[in-house]
């Protein structure tokens, strides 16, 4: 009996420790991809992206190891009120060696407080670095609405017919503003802070199975005292977004229309750019001028077509029209059908086409890319991960223009601008060619 009594306090302590550990369990989430590939003409795997396009079709066309590791925890809860701490560290290396050192990117560190305001039930207050309500097309890894960065906001305010969210975030550009030093010399090393103010109204039910989201983003350069912007800089701009999401065929379809002005045109996703400068091959500074407008019309989704077939798809038209004539018209269309042989094995094909017209030259670059992959994945959905795939990719392109980065901006008036492929006897763009690659890759999110 004495032995039993002696063991009882220890058992209680262990049980309490286990319960405490469970109550304070850390959430571990993330994303990663890595693999190995070869090019048909020799050497390591090459990846194919059309000059002037802001993304590429990614299946069998990713040449790096990339990972995001997220740790988070609900650190306090009382009734329906809670605080959650979230972090995210990202890594990217060229996957060419065993030991590849890199500096990590600290992408998220924020606290989210839910139901803290009595008269706004269901809302969340947050502050810190955060991936904020990002909208993307997975199959081309294209983020068309993404203001992520250090910031603060109040989201998911129930207004009866939808959810209202308010946020402010920041992104900085190197060398964007200057101060007078001496002898008529200006120092362009100071970073320029770009602030973005975001308002969204989401989850508005406008038809059976369909919701509407509307958003307005205003971005502007925020200068320090006694500093001035680079001549010709794009100091502010607007982005307007309307997105309709429809439930269809056990999946979804998203139709998006976006219009942007000036500093919000180049990235086209809600972050301001153009108040900074770039540096040429000789480290001379030249301004980035994004004044103009952007129109984007996008349709994408993922659907199920019976027990054995799933498919992703995308179609997009984007027109960036700049006052300096260095804009582009880009349209892209692609599909990724998946046939499921078993609940964990499938064959996936991706077919994508890009066409980019230079505003300055009127010439066009185009590329089509086809990938066939045999895949083993954790489930029978096109979204199931982890997945291990072996693939073969073929790409053919014909490029009639490219960007001129020869020399420096002081002696080359075309530096950083679009020029014809044979401009001044040179060779710009990728020419007219084709190539194929093959390899294996894993991809996981959890």
Curated annotation (Swiss-Prot):
Residues 1-25 form the signal peptide. It is found in: Cell outer membrane. It holds the Pfam family LamB. One of its GO terms (molecular function) is maltodextrin transmembrane transporter activity. GO terms for cellular component: cell outer membrane; pore complex. SUPFAM superfamilies: Porins. It comes from the Bacteria. The record marks 31, 66, 99, 252, 383, 445 as: Greasy slide, important in sugar transport. It catalyses: beta-maltose(in) = beta-maltose(out). Involved in the transport of maltose and maltodextrins. Homotrimer formed of three 18-stranded antiparallel beta-barrels, containing three independent channels. This is Maltoporin. It comes from Escherichia coli (strain SE11).
């Amino acid at each position: 009996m004495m032995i039993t009594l002696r063991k009882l306090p220890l058992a209680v302590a262990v049980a309490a420790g286990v319960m405490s550990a469970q109550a304070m369990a850390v959430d571990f989430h993330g994303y990663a991809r890595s693999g190995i590939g070869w090019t048909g003409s020799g050497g390591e795997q090459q990846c194919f992206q059309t000059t002037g396009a802001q993304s590429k079709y990614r299946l069998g066309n990713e040449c790096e190891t990339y990972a995001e590791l997220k740790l988070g925890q609900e650190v306090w809860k009382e009734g329906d009120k809670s605080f959650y701490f979230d972090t995210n560290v990202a890594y990217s290396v060229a996957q060419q060696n065993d030991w590849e050192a890199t500096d990590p990117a600290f992408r998220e560190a924020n606290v989210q407080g839910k139901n803290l305001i009595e008269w706004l039930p269901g809302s969340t207050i947050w502050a810190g670095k955060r991936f904020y309500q990002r909208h993307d097309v997975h199959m081309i890894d294209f983020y068309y609405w993404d203001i992520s960065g250090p910031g603060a906001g109040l989201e998911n305010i129930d207004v009866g017919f939808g959810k209202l969210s308010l946020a402010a975030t920041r992104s900085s550009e190197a060398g964007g503003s200057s101060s007078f030093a001496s002898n008529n010399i200006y120092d362009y090393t100071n970073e320029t802070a770009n602030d973005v103010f975001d308002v969204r109204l989401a989850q508005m039910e406008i038809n059976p199975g369909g919701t509407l989201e509307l958003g307005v983003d205003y971005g502007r350069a925020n200068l320090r005292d006694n500093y001035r912007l680079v001549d010709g800089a794009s100091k502010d701009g607007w982005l307007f977004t309307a997105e309709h999401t429809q439930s269809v065929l056990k999946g979804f379809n998203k139709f998006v229309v976006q219009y942007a002005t000036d500093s919000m045109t180049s990235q086209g996703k809600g972050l301001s750019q153009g108040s900074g400068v770039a540096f040429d091959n000789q480290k001379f500074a030249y301004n980035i001028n994004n004044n103009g407008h952007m129109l984007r019309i996008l349709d994408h989704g993922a659907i199920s077509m019976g027990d054995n077939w799933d498919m992703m798809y995308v179609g997009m038209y984007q027109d960036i029209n700049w006052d300096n004539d260095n804009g582009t018209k880009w349209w892209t269309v692609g599909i990724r059908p998946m046939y499921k042989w078993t609940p964990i094995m499938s064959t996936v094909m991706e077919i994508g086409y890009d066409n980019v017209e230079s505003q300055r030259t009127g010439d066009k670059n185009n590329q089509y890319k086809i990938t066939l992959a045999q895949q083993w994945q954790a489930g029978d959905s096109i979204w199931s991960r982890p997945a291990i795939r072996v693939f073969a990719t073929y790409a053919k392109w014909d490029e009639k223009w490219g960007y001129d980065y020869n020399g420096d901006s002081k002696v080359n008036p075309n530096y950083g601008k679009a020029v014809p492929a044979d401009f001044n006897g040179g060779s710009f763009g990728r020419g007219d060619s084709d190539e194929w690659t093959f390899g294996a890759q894993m991809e996981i999110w959890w």
